[in-house]
Amino acid sequence: MKRVLFALLVATACVPALADLALATAKNCMACHAIDKKLVGPSYKDVAAKYAGQKDAADKLAVKIMKGGSGVWGPVPMPANTQVNEAEAKKLATWVLSLK
């Protein structure tokens, strides 16, 4: 019984991470980013490390996701993502920051 409960607990913990990866894929984030390697943009783990310990990091990153930016990660700018609403941007930012 303990093994079954443990397996359910682990599986339940993975569902939000998979849902957030699905959201990132649906919103085309994964065209330029990967979790653990640089593509066109930085890896999400690098983004999480850069924002680690910053006050209001999720809010700052959510704005960056929606409005884009340039000059932080090199010469290629991140375009604005008009297909991402505020709630989705906050969810994506929280997910990215959770990656270690």
Segments and roles (model prediction):
Residues D36, K55, G68-V72, L99-K100:
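A general structural signal marking secondary-structure boundaries and capping sites
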Residues A22, V96-K100:
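Short hydrophobic/aromatic patches at helix-to-coil boundaries
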Residues K50-K60:
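Short microdomains enriched in Cys/His and/or Lys/Arg
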Residues M1-L18:
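Classic N-terminal secretory signal peptides
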Residues A31, V40-Y51, K64-A93:
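Axial heme c-ligation environment in periplasmic c-type cytochrome domains
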Residues L18-I35:
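Sequence/structural segment immediately N-terminal to covalent heme-attachment motifs in c-type
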